[in-house]
């Protein structure tokens, strides 16, 4: 929105700063951070009153959680999403269709997560939105977003690029409408599965957002993309502003979500943020790199899949508990140990993901 101020730059030179993506990304980060800082306590207080008993704690989870997390309100994703959306609308170029597509996915997934959280809190049960209906809605939203990208994007919007291989990509054609939604829906649910400990999901989300902010900036620049041998995606650089808003809102939320958490992000936040990461990855044509950068989310998801398949086929569990962060809790790791070590893994994976830009 603030980009319109650039038309007055001939009369006041500093307004020319609003032309630069890097400046607006910093502004989006700061705005989202202060928004969540300011409104966070008010939102937490309101949710605590509305929810009463807070998020129901699973009886089949770690027993310590029944004591340490009981009564904590959920739906903290409202803090993140409100800060993220307000900041994006303020600092991004609203004529950029990628911004609107990503916000569409984020808001849509956030609404699904919100309804899921509402059902869990109102019924005081871990059973929320019926899985099949929820998945169908996610696929519908992701499919609509990918279709919009096809209509508004470039000729290589439907291509799938492979990291570390210069210029090699496969044109998916209409199959893009299968692969794209799969990436977005998978990312949303993977982050959702990871959100099981105080601060565990939000920091890896911020790390991934920062990484894809860099990738979006490079992919949206004709000179940098040509030099690196990656697809040039006109307008993709504007998504750096969105990822900057994610980082700012995430930092603000972490202030209240640090152990012991005053609030949980719930499905409202985790599903929306995961969907956002997936949508950005699809938009900038680095879907496979997302699996590297978000490798922690992939690991959490695979641990659940392996656990379910193993138990159904053999009656035995591979892990003491799934997702895998609970497995390490059962091994005797304290919650802060699990969280910080997983943060380290996420940071290392982000560095590996970024390195693929030069390994070509």
From Swiss-Prot:
Disulfide bonds: none
GO molecular function: metal ion binding; phospho-N-acetylmuramoyl-pentapeptide-transferase activity; UDP-N-acetylmuramoyl-L-alanyl-D-glutamyl-meso-2,6-diaminopimelyl-D-alanyl-D-alanine:undecaprenyl-phosphate transferase activity
Keyword Cell division: yes
EC number: 2.7.8.13
InterPro entries the UniProt entry points to: Glycosyl_transferase_4, PNAcMuramoyl-5peptid_Trfase, PNAcMuramoyl-5peptid_Trfase_CS
TM region(s), chain numbering: 27-47, 74-94, 99-119, 135-155, 165-185, 199-219, 236-256, 263-283, 288-308, 337-357
UniProt catalytic activity: UDP-N-acetyl-alpha-D-muramoyl-L-alanyl-gamma-D-glutamyl-meso-2,6-diaminopimeloyl-D-alanyl-D-alanine + di-trans,octa-cis-undecaprenyl phosphate = di-trans,octa-cis-undecaprenyl diphospho-N-acetyl-alpha-D-muramoyl-L-alanyl-D-glutamyl-meso-2,6-diaminopimeloyl-D-alanyl-D-alanine + UMP
Entry-linked CDD domains: GT_MraY (cd06852)
Keywords: Cell cycle, Cell division, Cell inner membrane, Cell membrane, Cell shape, Cell wall biogenesis/degradation, Magnesium, Membrane, Metal-binding, Peptidoglycan synthesis, Transferase, Transmembrane, Transmembrane helix
Any one GO cellular component localisation term in the record: plasma membrane
Cofactor (UniProt): Mg(2+)
Residues making up the signal peptide according to the UniProt record: none
Lipid bilayer topology: Multi-pass membrane protein
Major localization class: membrane
Localization in the cell: Cell inner membrane
GO BP annotations, alphabetical order: cell division; cell wall organization; peptidoglycan biosynthetic process; regulation of cell shape
Name of the top EC class for this enzyme: transferase
Family to which the UniProt record says this protein belongs: Belongs to the glycosyltransferase 4 family. MraY subfamily.
Protein task: Catalyzes the initial step of the lipid cycle reactions in the biosynthesis of the cell wall peptidoglycan: transfers peptidoglycan precursor phospho-MurNAc-pentapeptide from UDP-MurNAc-pentapeptide onto the lipid carrier undecaprenyl phosphate, yielding undecaprenyl-pyrophosphoryl-MurNAc-pentapeptide, known as lipid I.
Protein name: Phospho-N-acetylmuramoyl-pentapeptide-transferase
Species in which this protein is naturally found: Methylocella silvestris (strain DSM 15510 / CIP 108128 / LMG 27833 / NCIMB 13906 / BL2)
Gene that encodes it: mraY
């Amino acid at each position: 929105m603030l980009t319109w101020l650039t038309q007055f730059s001939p009369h006041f030179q500093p307004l020319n700063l609003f032309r630069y993506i890097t400046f607006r990304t910093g502004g989006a980060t700061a705005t989202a951070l202060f928004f969540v800082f300011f409104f966070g306590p008010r939102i937490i207080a309101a949710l605590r009153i509305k929810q009463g008993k807070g998020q129901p704690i699973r009886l089949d989870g770690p027993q310590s959680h029944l004591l340490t997390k009981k009564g904590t309100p959920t739906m903290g994703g409202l803090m993140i999403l409100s800060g993220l959306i307000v900041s994006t609308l303020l600092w991004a170029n609203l004529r950029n269709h990628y911004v609107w597509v990503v916000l569409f996915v984020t808001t849509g997934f956030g609404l699904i997560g919100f309804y899921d959280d509402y059902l869990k809190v109102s019924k005081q049960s871990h059973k929320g939105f019926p899985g099949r209906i929820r998945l169908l809605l996610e696929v519908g939203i992701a499919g609509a977003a990918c279709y919009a990208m096809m209509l508004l994007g470039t000729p290589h919007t439907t291509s799938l690029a492979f990291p570390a291989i210069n210029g090699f990509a496969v044109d998916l054609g209409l199959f893009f409408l299968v692969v794209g939604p799969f990436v977005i829906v998978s990312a949303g649910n993977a982050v959702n599965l990871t959100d099981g400990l105080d601060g565990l999901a939000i920091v890896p989300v911020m790390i991934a957002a920062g990484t894809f902010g860099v990738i979006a900036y490079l992919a949206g620049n004709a000179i940098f993309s040509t030099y690196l041998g990656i697809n040039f995606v006109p307008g993709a650089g504007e998504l750096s502003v969105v990822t900057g808003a994610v980082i700012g809102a995430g930092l603000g939320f972490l202030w209240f979500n640090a152990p012991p958490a005053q609030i949980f992000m719930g499905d409202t936040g985790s599903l929306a943020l995961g969907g956002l990461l997936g949508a950005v990855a699809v938009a900038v044509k680095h879907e496979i790199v997302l699996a590297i950068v978000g490798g922690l989310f992939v690991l959490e998801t695979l641990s659940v899949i392996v656990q379910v398949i193993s138990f159904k086929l053999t009656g035995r569990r591979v892990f003491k508990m799934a997702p895998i962060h609970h497995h390490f809790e059962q091994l005797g790791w304290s919650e802060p140990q699990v969280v910080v070590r997983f943060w380290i893994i996420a940071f290392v994976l982000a560095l590996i993901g970024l390195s693929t830009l030069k390994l070509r």
